[in-house]
Regions:
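Carboxylate-rich, polar loop motifs that coordinate divalent cations or form catalytic acidic clusters
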Residues: 1-316
Length: 316
C-alpha cells in the first residue's frame, strides 16, 4: 500500500495553484504559488491516500482513518462510518474515481461505496444481474475510470471491468485478469488502447476492450524490473514514468530506452528520496514526483529536479 505523506500538498498544487509568478528567473518553483491545507483548516485527517478533482471542480480527499472529505475551496464536507445520514463502509479509503454519470466510486478494504456528487448521497446503481452487490462487498484497493467510460476495480488478486448503458446502469461486470495468489496490482495506467499494470517482475499490459479473462502481455525487456517494487505508472506523451520504492524510471516508448533516477546525498538536484509515492503532470506539462520527503519538480532542460518540502517551502 502506498504511503502518501506529501500527496495532499501535491494535488492541491496541481488543482489550481500553478499560476505563473512575476519574475520567473531562478528556481523552477518560483513559477508557482503553493499553499497547504491541514487539520487546522478542517481537513479531517492528515494522512491522505488519494485526491480527485471531480467534473464540477470540487476536490474529494480519501483519508486513512476519517473516510472521505469534499473540499469546495472554503470548507470540508465529511463522509465516514459514523455519519448517520451518509454512512460509508470504511474510514480507510484507498482510491477514488468519477464515472460518466457524476458518481464518485470509493474503494476500501471493506468494499466499494458510490456517492452522487449532486445529491451528496450514497447510491445503488441498477444491476440486472446483481453482480455489483457481490463486487461491492469485496475488499478493493485500486480503481480507474478509463477513456471508454468503463470502471476498472482491483479486488484482491483480480481485476474487474464494469461497463454501463446510456442511463448509467450496469451493463456487464467482467473479470478480465487474475494475478497469482499473494500478488496484487498496485497501479494502472491507460496507454492508448491498453492498461499498463505492474505484473510479475515488471510492467505488462492488457487490452481495455477485453470482455473476458486475459493474460497480461509482455511489452519490452526494458520494462522487466526484477526486485523493483513498482508503486505508480504515469504517461507523458511518448514516455512512461515509473515510480518505485527504488527510485524513478523514465521509459521512452519509441526508443525503448530506460533511465533510472535516484537520491544522491551529494547532489541537491537529485530526487529528495527514493520511495516514490505518486507522479503527476501539471497543466504546464511539468512532471511532479512525490516521495516520502517532499515533491520534486522535474526540469526537462537540465534533466534534474528541484525539491519542495515542508521545511523549505520555496525549494532547495
Amino acid at each position: 500500500m502506498k504511503i502518501h505523506c506529501f500527496l495532499f500538498a501535491l494535488f492541491i498544487f496541481l488543482s489550481s495553484l500553478y499560476m505563473q509568478a512575476e519574475g520567473t528567473a531562478g528556481k523552477w518553483s518560483e513559477r508557482y504559488n503553493f499553499t497547504a491545507i491541514t487539520m487546522d483548516e478542517g481537513l479531517p485527517h492528515n494522512f491522505v491516500d488519494d485526491i480527485l478533482k471531480d467534473s464540477q471542480g470540487f476536490l474529494w480527499i480519501a483519508t486513512r482513518g476519517e473516510g472521505i472529505a469534499r473540499y469546495d475551496g472554503y470548507e470540508f464536507t465529511a463522509f465516514h462510518m459514523g455519519n448517520t445520514r451518509i454512512k460509508l463502509r470504511s474510514n480507510f479509503i484507498n482510491k477514488l474515481c468519477e464515472d460518466n454519470f457524476k458518481r464518485i466510486w470509493a474503494v476500501s478494504e471493506m468494499g466499494i461505496d458510490i456517492l452522487d456528487i449532486q445529491t451528496m448521497q450514497t447510491v445503488q446503481v441498477t444491476d440486472m444481474k446483481d453482480k455489483l452487490i457481490s463486487l461491492c462487498n469485496r475488499p478493493s484497493h485500486l480503481i480507474l475510470h478509463s477513456k471508454a467510460g468503463n470502471i476498472w476495480v482491483c479486488s484482491e488478486n483480480n481485476l474487474f471491468k464494469i461497463t454501463f448503458d446510456k442511463q448509467g446502469d450496469i451493463k456487464q461486470i467482467i473479470k478480465t485478469c487474475e494475478v497469482p495468489a499473494g500478488e496484487s496490482i498496485r497501479t494502472i495506467c491507460e496507454v492508448e488502447d491498453y492498461l499498463w499494470i505492474n505484473y510479475k517482475d515488471g510492467i505488462y499490459r492488457i487490452k481495455e476492450s477485453a470482455m473476458e479473462v486475459q493474460e497480461p502481455t509482455f511489452i519490452s525487456s526494458a520494462l522487466q524490473l526484477p526486485g523493483v517494487s513498482i508503486q505508480v505508472i504515469c504517461r507523458k506523451e511518448n514516455e512512461i514514468w515509473i515510480g518505485s520504492a527504488q527510485g524513478l524510471f523514465r521509459y521512452n516508448m519509441d526508443t525503448e530506452l530506460m533511465k533510472h533516477y535516484m537520491y544522491d546525498p551529494n547532489d541537491n538536484s537529485s530526487l529528495s528520496q527514493n520511495f516514490i509515492t505518486d507522479i503527476a503532470e501539471t497543466g504546464e506539462h511539468t512532471m511532479l514526483v512525490a516521495t516520502l520527503k517532499g515533491i520534486n519538480l522535474y526540469n526537462a532542460l537540465t534533466d534534474n529536479f528541484e525539491r519542495i518540502n515542508k521545511d523549505t517551502g520555496e525549494g532547495e
